[in-house]
Amino acid sequence: EIFVSKNENEPQIPASLAKLFVIEYASTLADLDSIVVADYGAISLTKPGSSVAQIKEKEYFLHNLFAAMLVPSGNDAAYVVADYCGGLLSPQAESCQERVRIFMENLNLHLQQQGYLDTVLYDPSGFDMEALTTTLDLKEVVYRLLEYSWFREIVSQNTYTATLPDGRGQIWQ
């Protein structure tokens, strides 16, 4: 229950909170246990100094990448998710840049269809100054994500240990 609300419709830059919208949309496109190959092209789209999840060229489950986006706020993981989902949306797309662009275009359509009318995103990591959202849209996406037990499990921890498809673990803090 909300007791006080102020400026909830005022546009603001979402920064890393953009990843919440990316995760919400990506979870509608693929199964959490989908195996995603992180390739150099997608990882290299990450802005210098923002690869905090240390995603490597190997296989991850989609839910591993969601955890990497949420716990250490991994921009590298966000690009890998956008690349993977862009490939699902447009299998003929030839480059990582094209797949990420297609994902972002479709994400923005999805946002409008879901009622996030004051949110527009241009970068899956939120590392841009043109994106906009509102506190109201952020509240709605968080409420929607909190319906999922996998999301609650990830965000309830400040350290997350992921089991990768090869059986090895990776820890994010």
Give the ranges of each region predicted by the language model:
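Domain-terminus/edge residues, biased toward the C-terminal soluble/receptor-binding domains
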Residues: 116-117, 129-137, 142-173
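Active-site-adjacent loops and short helices of periplasmic peptidoglycan-processing enzymes
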Residues: 1-136, 145-149
